[in-house]
């Protein structure tokens, strides 16, 4: 094992995660229909600051992400600063690492803290699958540029006359990988077949996720970390995630047809995460700054790791690659963890990663490591459910997982937790958290 890399400032301060908050997560075109991601981001950051009672000018940086970006607000981070009453001099920039975007935002703020350029910052992400950048065809886009440069009406009419009817149809955002043309669900199907993961196993994991998420809400475990929102026409509050199937039975999952490989597949809408709207954010500070402000941190960032692999096969194995690296940098092993939380993009992807984390062969032949990362104890795994139940607003999921894991660690008396996610483009992320 390589030497651990402590995440501390030049003065020896740990990176404290002071608080975290998210909106309820809403299925596409439901509670947040028509609400753009930038407004969701403003909601959560504004409420986070109000609850924390931290002076707005104490926040020196805001790093925020959005995967499905809107052309009219390309820097969502700066719009949030300007729309929440924060100090206009607060530095703000946007990041994107697909489904690991808020992991990246947290890492960036942590690096600024370690460099000593700031003492407090906010990281997070927001996405809306209900407000999408519907585009135009390449032919129409080119014609519009040429028309703008045309000097006469005749030239403009000539340019438009070259267009076909299909060129005028709207173009929705792509759901496939740009480099391969594969959808993430196609990769999930490939991984299910490659690693022998059955439909029954996938449905069982999805059912487990929903049952545990429903139980977490019923026991009041999420109330502190999820805000109540009000959206037009402001008649009813929206306070709880609306994707969770608390009353479903395992038999209900078997009724759905495969969504990607319709003849021989096993990946369905029920054992995959749904398209979702929502936002989440966390406040990070140096440990000494938190003490100055009289704040008790939720916990601390112990380590993080980002990885990248090939996109043609096993593209969603990011957790199996990034987890051992994050553990190594933290100076820990799988046995040291109190909690292990993995983003459930698909049940097939989740089960494949769990399988390979415990595989000696994968460790030796693929990772070049002497031994397996370690089996994940079911009693520590996604104990409050996961993304299949809560939903997955792409850029917000990491911040949800971090906040949720730290609160649960605190309820258990402290310890270490690891959060990890796969992401489009063969990317992976993992972070080790510590609570006292």
Swiss-Prot record:
GO annotation, cellular component aspect: cytosol
Protein name: 3-ketoacyl-CoA thiolase
Any one GO MF annotation of this record: acetyl-CoA C-acyltransferase activity
Lineage summary: Bacteria, Pseudomonadati, Pseudomonadota, Gammaproteobacteria, Enterobacterales
Database matches in InterPro entries: Ac-CoA_C-AcTrfase_FadI (IPR012806), Thiolase (IPR002155), Thiolase-like (IPR016039), Thiolase_acyl_enz_int_AS (IPR020615), Thiolase_AS (IPR020610), Thiolase_C (IPR020617), Thiolase_CS (IPR020613), Thiolase_N (IPR020616)
Family listed: Belongs to the thiolase-like superfamily. Thiolase family.
GO biological process, one term: fatty acid beta-oxidation
Active site residues according to the UniProt entry: 99 (acyl-thioester intermediate), 392 (proton acceptor), 422 (proton acceptor)
UniProt pathway annotation: Lipid metabolism; fatty acid beta-oxidation
Organism from which the protein derives: Salmonella paratyphi C (strain RKS4594)
Assigned EC number: 2.3.1.16
Catalysis performed (reactions): an acyl-CoA + acetyl-CoA = a 3-oxoacyl-CoA + CoA
UniProt-annotated location(s): Cytoplasm
Keyword list, A-Z: Acyltransferase, Cytoplasm, Fatty acid metabolism, Lipid degradation, Lipid metabolism, Transferase
Subunit structure: Heterotetramer of two alpha chains (FadJ) and two beta chains (FadI).
Described function: Catalyzes the final step of fatty acid oxidation in which acetyl-CoA is released and the CoA ester of a fatty acid two carbons shorter is formed.
Keyword ATP-binding: no
């Amino acid at each position: 094992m390589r030497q651990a890399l402590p995440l501390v400032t030049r003065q020896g301060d740990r990176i404290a995660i002071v608080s975290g908050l998210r909106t309820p997560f809403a299925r596409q075109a439901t509670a947040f229909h028509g609400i753009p991601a930038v407004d969701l981001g403003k909601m959560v950051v504004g409420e986070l600051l109000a609850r924390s009672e931290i002076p707005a000018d104490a926040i020196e940086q805001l790093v925020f992400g959005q995967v499905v970006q809107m052309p009219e607000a390309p820097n969502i981070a700066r719009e949030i600063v300007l729309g929440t009453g924060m100090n206009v001099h607060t530095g703000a920039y946007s990041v994107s690492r697909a489904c690991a975007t808020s992991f990246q935002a947290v890492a960036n703020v942590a690096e600024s803290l370690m460099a000593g350029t700031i003492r407090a910052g906010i990281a997070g992400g927001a996405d809306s699958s209900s407000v999408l950048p519907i585009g135009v065809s390449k032919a129409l886009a080119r014609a519009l540029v040429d028309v703008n440069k045309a000097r006469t009406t005749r030239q403009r009419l000539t340019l438009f006359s070259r267009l076909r009817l299909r060129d005028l149809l709207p173009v929705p955002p792509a759901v496939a990988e740009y480099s391969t043309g594969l959808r993430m669900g196609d990769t999930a199907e490939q991984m299910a077949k490659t690693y022998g993961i059955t439909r029954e196993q996938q449905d069982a994991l999805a059912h487990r996720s929903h049952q545990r998420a429903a139980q977490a809400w019923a026991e009041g475990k999420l109330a502190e970390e999820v805000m109540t929102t009000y959206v037009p026409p402001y008649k009813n509050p929206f306070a709880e995630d609306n994707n969770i199937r608390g009353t479903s039975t395992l038999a209900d999952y078997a009724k759905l047809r495969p969504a990607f490989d319709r003849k021989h597949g096993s990946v369905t809408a029920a054992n995959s995460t749904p398209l979702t709207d929502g936002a989440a954010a966390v406040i990070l500070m140096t440990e000494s700054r938190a003490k100055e402000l009289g704040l008790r941190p939720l916990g601390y960032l112990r380590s993080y790791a980002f990885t990248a692999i090939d996109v043609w096969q096993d593209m969603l194995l990011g957790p199996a690659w990034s987890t051992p690296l994050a553990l190594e940098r933290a100076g820990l092993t799988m046995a040291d963890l109190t909690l292990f939380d993995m983003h459930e993009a698909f049940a097939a992807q989740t089960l494949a990663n769990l399988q390979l984390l415990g595989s000696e062969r994968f460790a030796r032949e693929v990772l070049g490591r002497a031994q397996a990362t370690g089996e994940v104890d079911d009693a520590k795994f996604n104990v409050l459910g996961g993304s299949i139940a809560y939903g997955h607003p792409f850029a917000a999921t990491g911040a949800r997982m971090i906040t949720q894991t730290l609160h649960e660690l605190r309820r258990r008396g402290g310890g270490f937790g690891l959060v990890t996610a796969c992401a489009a483009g063969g990317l992976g992320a993992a972070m080790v958290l510590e609570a006292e």
